[in-house]
Design a protein with these regions (language model features):
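A conserved amphipathic terminal alpha-helix motif
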Residues: 1-11, 124-186
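Hydrophobic residues positioned within well-ordered beta-strands of beta-sheet architectures
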Residues: 29-31, 83-85, 118
Length: 187
């Protein structure tokens, strides 16, 4: 199957475990996803600037596998926005913590009998934003899984995600988190 065929046929997988809890003046979204891939393969997908643009909503100016300053370049169609991506923890292949602008992403990778469990803790502005964020990460991690399966789809991020089921995921995660969905086109 070609990348264009895989992309055309993409549909979001089932909802994943998600919760949002107060974290000081912000909210912490926790998103859990199981993969059949090794921790090392997942670590590479999370840290390698050659792999990030194939699935993530950003790329990086360097490998994120070491602590120190980094710049993340958020991608939405033709728009590029540079954000702080400073890595504060990098314990290969199990823990990665870095900034994404004002947010903090903490990725925890655990080996399981079936492969790997990835837990993402992402700080967001408010509880309603958590549902939007969960929908976005859901799609990105579906794409990462396909990439690791050697069946690349290509990134589905930003406004383009609307064409691939993002709105429905946003509504479903909003219901799961007990909040009203936000329409990002009205923000």
């Amino acid at each position: 199957m070609t990348e264009s065929d895989a992309r055309r046929d993409y549909r979001p997988g089932p909802l994943r475990h998600v919760e949002a809890r107060p974290d000081g003046t912000r909210w912490a979204l926790t998103f859990v996803r199981d993969f059949t891939h090794s921790p090392a393969a997942l670590w590479t997908a999370l840290t390698d600037p050659g792999e990030l643009p194939q699935w993530a909503p950003y790329t990086a100016d360097r490998n994120l596998g070491t602590v120190g300053p980094a710049t993340l370049i958020m991608v939405d169609g033709q728009d590029r926005t540079e954000l702080d991506g400073t890595v504060t923890r990098a314990e290969s292949p199990h823990v990665l913590e870095h900034a994404w602008g004002e947010d903090v992403l903490l990725w925890t990778i655990e080996e399981t009998d079936a492969g790997t469990r990835l837990t993402l803790r992402h700080t967001v502005d408010d509880q309603r934003t958590a549902a939007m964020t969960a929908a976005g990460w859901h799609m990105c991690l579906d794409v990462a899984d396909s990439l690791l399966e050697r069946n690349p789809i290509g990134p589905i991020v930003g406004a383009e995600a609307m064409n691939y089921g993002w709105r429905e995921l946003n509504e479903q995660y909003s219901e799961r988190l007990g909040v009203e969905p936000i329409d990002p086109t009205l923000r």
